[in-house]
């Protein structure tokens, strides 16, 4: 600033440089006086470039460094198959492969000299014993539990439509059955410790609400979730600030309060009571298969 003042005496237009230099000077002064980031304190202004590069580093790796086969958990080749199938375009790549066919773990399918027709009904599993009046023929591969709220509206819709197209089941997650789950795909209704979608005002199991939802044609099986998979022995919580009116309605919880998933169930406390609870759910659902997830 002092230098600009001296130059101004000789050449007044130098004041225009303050339009550019002024903000940089202020940023530099703030960097030198702050106490949170040592990089900015030691390298005022230019130190911000480090954080900018850190911000865009995933994109740099994806577009300039990562090869078609080196990405994790899904490399570019695998992602491309998903993109192409979602657009209903050809997903095959002819003229050889870029993979190392001699690498450990490489998988392939050998040609058969006597190929046979594969009946899709033979690669399904019948779920439900003699006590089930409505057993379910389940696919070997299905969509695991992911609730609406953890996933977006469009994601849930896409998954359920995919379940319908592929003739496999879609697990709702413990967040209950949302309108976005009801796109025609078979459902496995997961019930957690919060009994979302079938609970009383004080968070206990509500048989009437359960019966109303479980008897829907789209619901094929019910899964009891015994505890939080990511933190067994502990509960979960959805802060009131993140609770929307739609999610509150779907989960049958009041607005303005934290939504708790307790560490354990209140409908049963012993293995024998669990078996009795399973019997109760089977009867309320009209004889559909009931299982539990450890």
Predicted features along the sequence, with ranges:
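Conserved, well-structured core domains of diverse proteins
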Residues: 1-169, 175-185, 189-190, 194-230, ...
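Alpha/beta enzyme core
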Residues: 161, 177, 181-183, 202-294
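Short amphipathic alpha-helical segments with coiled-coil-like heptad repeat character
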Residues: 171-172, 282
């Amino acid at each position: 600033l002092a230098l600009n003042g001296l130059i101004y005496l000789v050449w007044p237009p130098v004041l225009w440089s303050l339009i550019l230099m002024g903000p940089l000077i202020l940023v530099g002064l703030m960097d030198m006086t702050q106490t949170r980031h040592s990089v900015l304190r030691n390298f005022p202004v230019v130190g911000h470039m480090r954080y900018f590069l850190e911000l865009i580093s995933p994109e740099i790796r994806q577009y300039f460094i990562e090869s078609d086969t080196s990405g994790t958990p899904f490399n570019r080749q695998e992602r491309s198959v998903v993109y192409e199938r979602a657009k209903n375009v050809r997903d095959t790549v002819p003229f050889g492969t870029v993979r190392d066919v001699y690498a450990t773990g490489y998988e392939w399918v050998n040609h058969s000299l006597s190929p046979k027709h594969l009946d899709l009904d033979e690669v399904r599993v019948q779920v439900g014993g003699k006590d089930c009046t409505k057993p379910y023929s389940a696919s070997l591969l299905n969509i695991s539990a992911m609730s609406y709220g953890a996933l977006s509206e469009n994601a849930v819709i896409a998954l359920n439509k995919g379940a319908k197209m592929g003739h496999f089941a879609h697990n709702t997650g413990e967040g209950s059955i949302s309108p976005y789950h009801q796109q025609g795909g078979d459902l496995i209704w997961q019930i957690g410790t919060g009994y979302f979608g079938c609970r009383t005002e004080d968070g206990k199991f509500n048989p009437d609400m359960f019966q109303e939802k479980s008897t829907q044609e789209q619901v094929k099986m019910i899964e009891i979730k015994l505890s939080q998979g990511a933190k067994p022995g502990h509960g979960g919580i959805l802060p009131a600030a993140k609770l929307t009116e739609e999610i509150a309605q779907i989960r049958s919880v009041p607005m303005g309060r934290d939504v708790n998933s307790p560490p354990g169930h209140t409908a049963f406390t012993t293995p024998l009571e669990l078996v009795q609870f399973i019997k109760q759910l089977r009867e309320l659902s009209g004889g559909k298969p009931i299982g539990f997830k450890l």
